[in-house]
From Swiss-Prot:
Residues annotated as glycosylated: N370, N812
Annotated signal sequence range: none
Residue ranges of domain SSD in the record: 394-552
Protein name: Protein patched homolog 2
Length: 1203
């Protein structure tokens, strides 16, 4: 009966599979997986030897190629347009956005500049004359902003958006209106006379002071001008718009103001107004009918009494609307003010941006620091500036991160022996990876992949951390060359042993990022593609160029030159330790501290029944260790930390050695072999590990339920900035979004009026839609159009009843009556367009509230030309735009009676306001309701879709989790296939995928506890975590697969040889990520640094703790099985002929099995641990008992131990 030895006494038997399997392959009975891997390793061996022979050429050509690609960075384009970054590619939103731009152009109708005022003391009522006075001070300061560009002065009145400027036939009135027509400013000050102070226009009439909105009474002005001009049309226009006395009829906020007009209700009483009462129900612009600002647009944090009366509010908001760059360009094109500056749309955009920046600056400085109120200002340019700042590469962080990596790589590869130190290799490796990252990004720029914030802020650090992992792995393996390896084959032997791991991890990383590109968000798709390309470039650099660097360093070490200062010889080169041969008995060989060479006879046979290859080692070799070095200058370092990369001595009998400090005896390999693996692989430790990881998985599953969808703009903007304060106040108090319901072409609007009204009603009934006041009609073009027709129909009926309009004349009727006359006689027939008999037999709007289809498009032409304020208020944005048609009541020619019909509409929209959207779930609910309303309308033949920022940026969440699960599942399948193909072992690939799936679930759950919301960016990190996790698992799995012995023994050896590279890789990744923690953007810190740091720590724990335990329990059987017997039957074994592997077969073999006699020179390093380590190895061999001392080993020989 056999018993297992203590894990502290585990023997070394980690050997490259290709070398171990060589005799068996030629014996013709090895399984295909090992044969294929051996073939692949042979290719890597040839590649390494070729690079070593031509290392100078490879290094020169590699640096030249990477440097040329890095120059492509000069062509990099940084994208900051939110629509281009976040709208899903190929989605219905993308198609709808394309349709909108195709019909209306690129620019929106206007841009918004906002002021939000809050009290410094939270919860304080802001509805007081004093608070509104401070708001007036800030708004007035902002409205007076002027910028000088191109030799011109630009103020608000020149660049603001003006809604529906009417066309007036009277030239004097037209010029006066052009100068006086007010800007659209949505402000609570419009409830008071002080709102007029924000309007900067003025006009001059002889005998009067300058006319401004602060002293303009339109009714009084019309009375004064009436005797001198025909103003009937203008008067009707003002009456329809319900202008009244404009601002001078409103109460004064400060009745003691010397300019407070006498017509103000509180001018004589001198009493301050009841602010809450005046603001209740909202405010109006100069037109009471078309310019109504609802409470929700002006006030935030409102509180009401039980009767619904407004009592208090905590925030005020004013919004200034400016023209778009295209509108500003068109407005001043050909104007005398811009004829000498080469006016262009780019100049118009520059003017607007300069004004907006100045607006924000002055508004924020308008109130003193000790004021009881605070002003937050924001503009569309501010958002662009934030995105530009967010996308800029921080040179300090990049340089800092790379310097940390350089320092770590250099220190971890230094050694006390100056000639054997590899600090220069570490420096060169990090610099090479940095060049590879730059070349990968340059290649992305050459391929036209745009850069964004994720590229510039994260990718340089992430790619560096990933790329340096393989540098450590290669450098570590290069110094662990098997004794007896010819100098010219060192690089080939290194790639032969580690190339498979590098290929596997790189391919999985590239596959991970390519799978992450399935997320259809342009910014993240670009990031994923760039990451895949950068990983590919670092893979090429590590596999081709870095071996050339190692080969050059090998020459330096062989010549005993100093590290870094390679022109000087090492001072340690004169210290030579001569290892003298010893007089040994038969079969006894000397054992060195660093490695052991023994010559043994091995007999290999294949049993036909089991198809197993069996190697038999006779107990004829005795291993005698010499006295150890008391100062420990020759350290045992089988697979330790990269700071011990040169722990193995060159295979020469004379070698240089510098004495190291006693503390240098400890290293990661020593820790893994003597402390970590024995502790981890004990039965009770395995149980504890499984329980703890099971608990972590269960806790993560609970955390996954806490993850919410969303990404607020406040997460992107740096905390503590004025922009963040504004966005926080806006999100808290004014969560309103302007949206539109767009109707497309492809159906007949004239015959679908009922369906259009039903669509509007369904949309208006959504929970998130802000309803209009009960006293106001819906604000849509179809309602305005119908109401206008009903108004002129009523005027016609009145004129007809009074006889002012007859069958043959309308000149004595009103303007509206004349318009109705012309519409009523239209037939829509090109042959007979007029029919006067219809004057009394038809109506412009029938009893059901529908417009006769034959009049629909002709009436649309008349309405658009005659009611500009109503058209502007409706925000219809018709395409194709109806033709212009001028009405002249006194022109009775037949041509004037003909009304050209508008072309069939292909684009129109109903505006809405969405409120109460705080969480992503609120947005998703509103989007789903809007989509359902459009789907129902589609069944009625109306083609419509919703438009606006909620649908642009939040619709992705409808299918984000589905995309995430799809990408992760596809990636896990791809990882399984790649691992199974390269490892040629589905069993091992399945365990790797199991661990990776656990890592993804746990990362997702920890995100929930950290408060990280699920958006496209965390999805990319989660998907990429599968590929990055391969870095921590595949090395251990491959080491387990290619060693011999029991599962526990193989797991221990896998840990022994991979603990240090995996740990160094994790540290390198963490150092690369460390600089992200210093970002000014909280978004970078939380969503990238925190998430990727957690991912790295999870990978370290799963790769070095959980996976070895799983492998020791569920791992696959060894690929190479060796059995050792006390007295093997030897049939004329051939005599050894030097080192290496030699084999031959006996001429007389039994039919049951074939014997192959092998004479092998076995390189056993590091030195054997106390205890016997040659033991029987069945398919899952038991552990042999341990000996108590190294002397037992030499006395007993390597025979099996039985208990």
């Amino acid at each position: 009966m056999t018993r297992s030895p203590p894990l502290r006494e585990l023997p070394p038997s980690y050997t490259p599979p290709a070398r171990t399997a060589a005799p068996q392959i030629l014996a013709g009975s090895l399984k295909a997986p090992l044969w294929l891997r051996a073939y692949f390793q042979g290719l890597l061996f040839s590649l390494g030897c070729g690079i070593q022979r031509h290392c100078g050429k490879v290094l020169f050509l590699g640096l030249l190629a990477f440097g040329a690609l890095a120059l492509g960075l000069r062509m990099a384009i940084i994208e900051t347009n939110l629509e281009q970054l976040w709208v899903e590619v190929g989605s219905r939103v993308s198609q709808e956005l394309h349709y909108t731009k195709e019909k209306l152009g690129e620019e929106a109708a206007y841009t918004s500049q906002m002021l939000i005022q809050t009290a410094r003391q939270e919860g304080e009522n802001i509805l007081t004359p004093e608070a509104l006075g401070l708001h007036l001070q800030a708004a007035l300061t902002a409205s007076k902003v002027q910028v000088s560009l191109y030799g011109k002065s630009w103020d608000l009145n020149k660049i603001c958006y003006k809604s529906g400027v009417p066309l007036i036939e009277n030239g004097m009135i037209e010029r006066m209106i052009e100068k006086l027509f007010p800007c659209v400013i949505l402000t609570p000050l419009d409830c008071f006379w002080e709102g007029a102070k924000l309007q900067g226009g003025s006009a001059y009439l002889p005998g009067r002071p300058d006319i401004q909105w602060t002293n303009l009474d339109p009714e009084q002005l019309l009375e004064e001008l009436g005797p001198f001009a025909s103003l009937e049309g203008f008067r009707e226009l003002l009456d329809k718009a319900q202008v009244g006395q404009a601002y001078v009829g409103r109460p004064c906020l400060h009745p003691d103001d010397l300019h407070c007009p006498p017509s103000a209700p509180n001018h004589h009483s001198r009493q301050a107004p009841n602010v809450a009462h005046e603001l209740s129900g909202g405010c109006h612009g100069f037109s009471h009918k078309f310019m109504h600002w609802q409470e929700e647009l002006l006030l935030g944090g409102m509180a009401r009494d039980p009767q619904g009366e407004l009592l208090r509010a905590e925030a005020l908001q004013s919004t200034f609307l400016l023209m778009s760059p295209r509108q500003l360009y068109e407005h001043f094109r050909g104007d005398y003010q811009t004829h000498d500056i080469g006016w262009s749309e780019e100049q118009a955009s520059t003017v607007l941006q300069a004004w907006q920046r100045r607006f924000v600056q002055l508004a924020q400085e308008a109130l003193p620091e000790n004021a009881s109120q605070q002003i937050h200002a924001f503009s569309s340019t501010t958002l662009d500036d934030i995105l530009h700042a967010f996308s800029e590469v921080s040179a300090a962080r990049v340089v800092g991160g790379y310097l940390l990596m350089l320092a770590y790589a250099c220190v971890t590869m230094l050694r006390w022996d100056c000639a054997q130190s590899q600090g220069s290799v570490g420096l060169a490796g990090v610099l090479l990876v940095a060049l590879a990252v730059a070349s990968g990004l340059g290649l992305c720029a050459l391929l036209g992949i745009t850069f964004n914030a994720a590229t510039t802020q994260v990718l340089p650090f992430l790619a560096l951390g990933i790329g340096v992992d393989d540098v450590f792995l290669l450098a570590h393996a290069f110094t662990e060359a098997l004794p007896g390896t010819p100098l010219q084959e060192r690089m080939g032997e290194c790639l032969q042993r580690t190339g498979t791991s590098v290929v596997l991890t790189s391919i999985n990383n590239m596959a991970a990022f390519l799978m992450a590109a399935l997320v259809p968000i342009p910014a993240l798709r670009a990031f994923s593609l760039q990451a895949a390309i950068v990983v590919g470039c670092t893979f090429v650099a590590v596999m081709l160029v870095f071996p050339a660097i190692l080969s050059l360093d090998l020459r330096r070490r062989h010549c005993q030159r100093l590290d870094v200062l390679c022109c000087f010889s090492s001072p340690c080169s004169a210290q030579v330790i001569q290892i003298l041969p010893q007089e040994l008995g038969d079969g006894t060989v000397p054992v060195g501290i660093a490695h052991l060479t023994a010559t043994v006879q091995a007999f290999t046979h294949c049993e036909a029944s089991s198809q197993h290859v069996v190697t038999i080692l006779p107990p004829q070799a005795h291993l005698v260790p010499p006295p150890s070095d008391p100062l420990g200058s020759e350290l045992f370092s089988p697979g330790g930390s990269t700071r011990d990369l040169l722990g193995q001595e060159e295979e020469t009998r004379q070698k240089a050695a510098c004495k190291s400090l006693p503390c240098a005896r400890w290293n990661l390999a020593h820790f893994a072999r003597y402390q970590f693996a024995p502790l981890l692989l004990q039965s009770h430790a395995k149980a504890i590990v499984l329980v703890l990881f099971g608990a972590l998985l269960g806790l993560s599953l609970y955390g996954a339920t806490l993850v919410q969808d969303g990404l607020a703009l406040t997460d992107v903007v740096p905390r503590g900035t004025k922009e963040h304060a504004f966005l926080s106040a806006q999100l808290r108090y004014f969560s309103l979004y302007e949206v539109a319901l767009v109707t497309q072409g492809g159906f007949d609007y004239a015959h679908s009026q009922r369906a259009l009204f039903d669509l509007h009603q369904r949309f208006s009934s959504l929970k998130a839609v802000l309803p209009p006041p009960a006293t106001q009609a819906p604000r849509t073009w179809l309602h305005y159009y119908r109401n206008w027709l009903q108004g002129i129909q009523a005027a016609f009926d009145q004129d007809w009843a009074s006889g002012r309009i007859t069958r043959h004349s309308y000149r004595n009727g009103s303007e509206d009556g004349a318009l109705a006359y012309k519409l009523l006689i239209q037939t829509g027939d090109a042959q007979e367009p007029l029919d006067f008999s219809q004057l009394t037999t038809r109506k412009l709007v029938d009893r059901e509230g529908l417009i006769p289809p034959e009049l629909f498009y002709m009436g649309l032409t008349v309405w658009v030309s005659s009611d500009p304020l109503g058209l502007a208020a409706s925000q219809a944005n018709f395409y194709p735009p109806p033709p212009e048609w001028l009405h002249d009541k006194y022109d009775t020619t037949g041509e004037n009676l003909r009304i050209p019909p508008a072309q069939p509409l292909e684009f129109a929209q109903f505006p809405f306001l969405l409120r109460g959207l705080q969480k992503t779930a609120d947005f998703v609910e509103a989007i789903e309701g809007a989509r359902a309303a459009c789907a129902e309308a589609g069944q009625a033949g109306v083609h419509a879709y919703p438009s606006g920022s909620p649908f642009l940026f939040w619709e992705q969440y409808l299918g984000l989790r589905r995309c995430f699960l799809l990408a992760v599942c596809i990636l896990l399948v791809c990882t399984f296939l790649v691992c199974a193909l390269l490892l040629l072992n589905p069993w091992t690939a399945g365990l790797i995928v199991l661990v990776l799936a656990m890592m993804t679930v746990e990362l997702f759950g920890i995100m929930g506890f950290l408060g990280i919301k699920l958006s496209a960016i965390p999805v990319v990190i989660l998907v990429a975590s599968v590929g990055i996790g391969v870095e921590f698992t595949v090395h251990v799995a491959l080491g387990f697969l290619t060693t011999q012995g029991s599962r526990n023994l193989r797991a221990a050896h896998a840990l022994e040889h991979t603990f240090a590279p995996v740990t160094d890789g994790a540290i390198s990744t963490l150092l690369g990520l460390l600089m992200l923690a210093g970002s000014h953007f909280d978004f970078i810190v939380r969503y990238f640094f925190a998430a990727l740091t957690v991912l790295t720590l999870l990978g370290l724990l799963h790769g070095l703790v959980l996976l070895p335990v799983l492998l020791s329990i569920l791992g696959p059987p060894p690929e190479v099985i060796q059995m050792y017997k006390e007295s093997p039957e030897i049939l004329s074994p051939p005599a050894p002929q030097g080192g290496g592997l030699r084999w031959g077969a006996s001429s007389s073999l039994p039919q049951s099995f074939a014997r192959v006699t092998t004479s092998m020179t076995v390189a056993i390093h590091p030195p054997p641990l106390p205890g016997a380590y040659i033991h029987p190895a069945p398919d899952e061999p038991p552990w042999s008992p341990a000996a108590t001392s190294s002397g037992n080993l030499s006395s007993r020989g390597p025979g099996p131990a039985t208990g």
